[in-house]
Amino acid sequence: MGLCDWQCLSRGHWSRDVAYAITAVLTPDNRRQWERDLLVRYLERFAALTGRRLDFNESFRHYREQMVHALLMCTITLCHSPLLPNMQPEETTLTMIERITTAMADLETI
């Protein structure tokens, strides 16, 4: 599994990064097979490091909601200002967008 990281800093809900990492990077088949286990693993590590145990169903809802943000972040790299250089190969961006939108359809995000 690889991850495209833009090296930017922002403040937001933990599920934003998790949704991006899982939906943009994994093939749809792998995501379908692993996403719940990956989220459980993330929540276990979160609890171990913070002492806060998060509810899985609520966390899964947050994960689904943040797929929209993942789509936005990928779309920006495809439709950036002409004043900026290409951020990544168009093929990479289109693959990530296809994966994210497939996840959104699978999980009825919209």
Regions found by a protein language model. Give the residues of each.
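Glycine-centered secondary-structure boundary/capping sites
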Residues: 50-51, 108
